[in-house]
Curated annotation (Swiss-Prot):
<feature type="modified residue" description="Phosphoserine">
    <location>
        <position position="39"/>
    </location>
</feature>
<comment type="similarity">
    <text>Belongs to the JIP scaffold family.</text>
</comment>
<dbReference type="GO" id="GO:0042802">
    <property type="term" value="F:identical protein binding"/>
</dbReference>
<feature type="region of interest" description="Disordered">
    <location>
        <begin position="426"/>
        <end position="448"/>
    </location>
</feature>
<feature type="modified residue" description="Phosphoserine">
    <location>
        <position position="352"/>
    </location>
</feature>
<comment type="function">
    <text>The JNK-interacting protein (JIP) group of scaffold proteins selectively mediates JNK signaling by aggregating specific components of the MAPK cascade to form a functional JNK signaling module. Required for JNK activation in response to excitotoxic stress. Cytoplasmic MAPK8IP1 causes inhibition of JNK-regulated activity by retaining JNK in the cytoplasm and thus inhibiting the JNK phosphorylation of c-Jun. May also participate in ApoER2-specific reelin signaling. Directly, or indirectly, regulates GLUT2 gene expression and beta-cell function.</text>
</comment>
<feature type="modified residue" description="Phosphoserine">
    <location>
        <position position="308"/>
    </location>
</feature>
<feature type="compositionally biased region" description="Low complexity">
    <location>
        <begin position="71"/>
        <end position="87"/>
    </location>
</feature>
<feature type="region of interest" description="JNK-binding domain (JBD)">
    <location>
        <begin position="126"/>
        <end position="282"/>
    </location>
</feature>
<dbReference type="GO" id="GO:0043066">
    <property type="term" value="P:negative regulation of apoptotic process"/>
</dbReference>
<dbReference type="GO" id="GO:0016192">
    <property type="term" value="P:vesicle-mediated transport"/>
</dbReference>
<keyword id="KW-0472">Membrane</keyword>
<dbReference type="GO" id="GO:0046329">
    <property type="term" value="P:negative regulation of JNK cascade"/>
</dbReference>
<dbReference type="GO" id="GO:0005829">
    <property type="term" value="C:cytosol"/>
</dbReference>
<feature type="modified residue" description="Phosphoserine">
    <location>
        <position position="404"/>
    </location>
</feature>
<keyword id="KW-0728">SH3 domain</keyword>
<feature type="region of interest" description="Disordered">
    <location>
        <begin position="69"/>
        <end position="368"/>
    </location>
</feature>
Amino acid sequence: MAERESGLSGGAASPPAASPFLGLHIASPPNFRLTHDISLEEFEDEDLSEITDECGISLQCKDTLSLRPPRAGLLSAGSSGSAGSRLQAEMLQMDLIDAASDTPGAEDDEEDDDELAAQRPGVGPSKAESGQEPASRSQGQGQGPGTGSGDTYRPKRPTTLNLFPQVPRSQDTLNNNSLGKKHSWQDRVSRSSSPLKTGEQTPPHEHICLSDELPPQGSPVPTQDRGTSTDSPCRRTAATQMAPPSGPPATAPGGRGHSHRDRIHYQADVRLEATEEIYLTPVQRPPDPAEPTSTFLPPTESRMSVSSDPDPAAYSVTAGRPHPSISEEDEGFDCLSSPEQAEPPGGGWRGSLGEPPPPPRASLSSDTSALSYDSVKYTLVVDEHAQLELVSLRPCFGDYSDESDSATVYDNCASASSPYESAIGEEYEEAPQPRPPTCLSEDSTPDEPDVHFSKKFLNVFMSGRSRSSSAESFGLFSCVINGEEHEQTHRAIFRFVPRHEDELELEVDDPLLVELQAEDYWYEAYNMRTGARGVFPAYYAIEVTKEPEHMAALAKNSDWIDQFRVKFLGSVQVPYHKGNDVLCAAMQKIATTRRLTVHFNPPSSCVLEISVRGVKIGVKADEAQEAKGNKCSHFFQLKNISFCGYHPKNNKYFGFITKHPADHRFACHVFVSEDSTKALAESVGRAFQQFYKQFVEYTCPTEDIYLE
């Protein structure tokens, strides 16, 4: 403090050029003296009126703070040496007692105070009075502010102009300082340096001047009138937005700008009488490094009493920095998110030299910018997430096509299938339920010899996404081997990579014909998809569900079979097991998708065999493939067919709905023919009649009735 005093007294002759006080003129009544050092640790009263009207506080004031020597060129010739310190005390006390003006009857008290202030003599006090000021203030702990002499104490209701009218509120709201942060001003004293000693210029402010009058530009010392104007309700907004971070001030040399602002940027809207004038010239400083933003600081950290700063010289530094008085701290959070209020409603920016308004600092809108950034970031995250979904779906479509998990039997026979085709079943597919895939081998496409074989040769609507034993195929796969037709017996549930020559490669859902089950839990089987034989671990496959033996025996006794040549368009999972609307919707879905790929991926020709057992889709193969014995087919048991029919407007389209043997899922298979499919639908109906007749004869034999 001695260094600070010496620095100030040394600058009395000529103020430093870098000082923020380029011009300060004070015309103050002589006996205008305030007690002001109300620190935060004593600020515990719940009623603000007790602080201003009674003696429930300790008035602490350091000698070095109240006896600061005046500076030549800053104080007028008619002012004494202690006028600067008294003015700073007045400025502080006015902010502290501002809440008292919110109570009923405050306006009447203000008028009386204005009259008292106008009647005071204009003679400045002596230095002896200034020297006795700390002692008199320390004695005022047990007295009210209005009980002392006029030279030492303020009247009971000190002067306030109430330039910022507020809605009357309860005292609890006005003075909610019971949770105030302790030792905040002591930390700031020990960790920060004086702005006068460092010679740091004042940063550009949001409000350069609060006056409605502009000084003449030709005056030697450009000044501003901070007397009686400005009704800026946004003073609380900007002050709250400029709240310092909750942590202690920075101690590094590079952080002195932060500590400087922490000390001074709360001390702006000082309320003086109409007779008092302060002329300050704003000095622009280069933008300081980015300061940490504090988004929605708690009230105990963002608010700051004017008395928490022990350096009174800093109180007259800022001409335009907003400062929340105690009565305004709580409501400062109500307008955090309104950056539009950062400008005074009366008329924008008023600079001392008429210069255009400076660009607003980032720290002034740190909270609002953080809010807007959060919303923008949220929007970007949503967009990015949607983009990632699109990217992740494309390889999934490719995997469906490669892994034979698409919606059509023929689509997976060619690797060039469009991703649109693989998405056929998405509209009717429930999320947790796997879509039944359909696949026929390349043997069914004699017109495309160059297309490589599909990775998976699955049964119609076999679920490639379900790995449980209950997710079996919608139909059974059969294959002609050595002139004899065999149906699949097992289905692969895991992928098996062979490590020896005699092992069989398996993909998930491969149709298998197990020929031998060894005791060491290895199976010797034939892979109907690849046409290869080998061994694999028994736990890599499960047995498929077959029709009962008695039903198979009844079907073999029937010689009735109808055959129809059609082209298979595809299959799609549907939400319901019957209905013309369901059938037509599935046909429309598949036909629309197939139209996009009909040129490079034409539908496969097949033969529909209708019998009492069910419906078999036999793939038409060429002679070379038939010689190899690779003729394959898909079989659907008649008991699992729930609905069939042709399109009412175009009878060339035929479809039937099948139920999954184990799961509660349904799929619709669509075909197209060159001729009408009415005969096909009638054949399926006749098969149902025969099947029902045989079923009834088996379950309810007539001879049993006669025997009874």
